[in-house]
Amino acid sequence: MIEAIINGLNYRLNEETLTAEVTAKRNGYEGDIIIPENVVFNDVTYRVTSIGEYAFRYCESLTSIVIPESVTSIGEYAFYECLSLTDITFQGTMAQWNEIILREDWNNNTPAKVVHCTDGDVEI
């Protein structure tokens, strides 16, 4: 596994599967975040497939997040206490969102009540 910072987001890169997981950042994230479907590190492309546990925990100034359709799991407490997070967008369909593995309390204490998908909204 490789730890890398790419365009302001922290990732854990798996060299065997060529996948990437978004991980926590020391000083947290803020504002509007767009997670890309793929990231490139040392000329190797990795597909972003997960948001790690605690990745955005206590990011009180995070206001919106765009999640690519390549994400298949969101870790426990990933968005815990993101008190300003009002807008979650998933770049896939509602059916794809419902297939994502959502770990315990992934969105605990966030004001967002729906995930906006390409074909409608899913209540959370």
Pin down the residues of each PLM region.
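Structural signature of tandem-repeat unit edges
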Residues: 8-10, 15-19, 28-50, 59-73, ...
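Acidic, Ser/Thr
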Residues: 24-26
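Short mixed-charge
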Residues: 106-111
